[in-house]
Design a protein with these regions (language model features):
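Helix-to-loop junction immediately C-terminal to a conserved catalytic motif
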Residues: 51
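ABC ATPase NBD coupling module
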Residues: 67-81, 109-116
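Conserved ABC ATPase signature
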Residues: 139-143
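Conserved catalytic motifs of ABC-family nucleotide-binding domains
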Residues: 160
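Catalytic Walker B motif of ABC-type/P-loop ATPase nucleotide-binding domains
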Residues: 164-168
């Protein structure tokens, strides 16, 4: 089976600085990966490889069977969904209109484009999936951060992606909104069983229960990679974040806290 994503020994340098140093990652259909690491670890750069928008300095990147540099990237990108909570709109679109922009891959409704009745129906189905049916006609500025996050998930799904990328999707959310968004992500394991996903975060509490695998990085290098329940542990997280922590796991969710000896008294 061809992997959804196959990154082999990639490096990336910018302005003489080594940002990524020999990372490899293979993602299969239906797997849900967490990309964990501290600020400045190289997570955003690595996600750029996954999205087929950033070229490595050395190494190879295969996305959906196509190798970057040897295939039409615009075709690949149509099958990649991207959820970014910093998504900016120029116009006050409704929830439904925002979701429909996922078809055209534009920030706003594309000029001279009108969605078909089938596309509008599909948008409404996805809006219902993320629990926002009552807000379908609400305009973007009136939405809470949590509602915006769930709208962007629906937007990413409308093009039926094979790979879903989530760039710190719970940024700026309170606890209730975070939990609602994570519950939404967990439902995708059932509604889109073949879709693979990669979620970027530096907080273990933001990992949904559907997480199957994890890649922990630090200073552009791999600390650990594999099944989430095997690699998201006290040893690896402490190494990745260069700080002694205790990792907990209960009811399918992870947590992290400082070791007692490292707390400031």
């Amino acid at each position: 089976m061809t992997p959804v994503l196959d990154i082999t020994d990639v490096t990336f340098r910018r302005d003489g600085k080594q940002i990524i140093d020999g990372i490899s990652l293979t993602v299969q259909s239906g797997e849900h990966w967490a990309l964990l690491g501290p600020n400045g670890a190289g997570k955003s750069t690595l996600l750029g490889f996954c999205a087929a928008v950033t070229f490595p300095t050395t190494g190879t990147v295969h996305v959906l069977g196509g190798q970057m540099g040897r295939t039409d990237l615009s075709v690949l990108r149509r099958s990649i969904g991207h959820v970014n909570p910093r998504h900016r709109l120029q116009y006050p679109l409704t929830v439904r209109e925002v979701v429909l922009t996922g078809i055209t891959a534009t920030i706003d409704i594309a000029a001279h484009w009108t969605p078909t009745p089938e596309q509008v129906c599909r948008a409404d189905e996805l809006i219902d999936t993320v629990g926002l049916s009552a807000r379908a006609d609400a305009i973007w500025p009136t939405l809470s951060q949590g509602e915006r996050g769930r709208t962007l998930i629906a937007r990413a799904l409308i093009a039926d992606p094979q790979l879903l990328l989530l760039d710190e999707p719970t940024t700026g959310l309170d606890v209730a909104a975070r939990e609602q968004l994570l519950e939404t992500l967990d439902t995708l394991d059932v509604s889109h069983p073949d879709m693979a996903s990669i979620l970027v975060t530096h907080h273990l509490e933001e990992l949904p229960t559907s997480t199957t695998h994890a890649l922990l990085i630090s200073q552009g290098r791999t600390v650990a990679s594999g099944l989430a329940h095997e690699v998201v542990n006290t040893e690896h997280v402490s190494e990745a974040f260069a700080h002694p922590v205790v990792v907990g796991f209960q009811d399918g969710r992870w947590s992290a806290r400082a070791k007692a000896s490292s707390r400031v008294l």
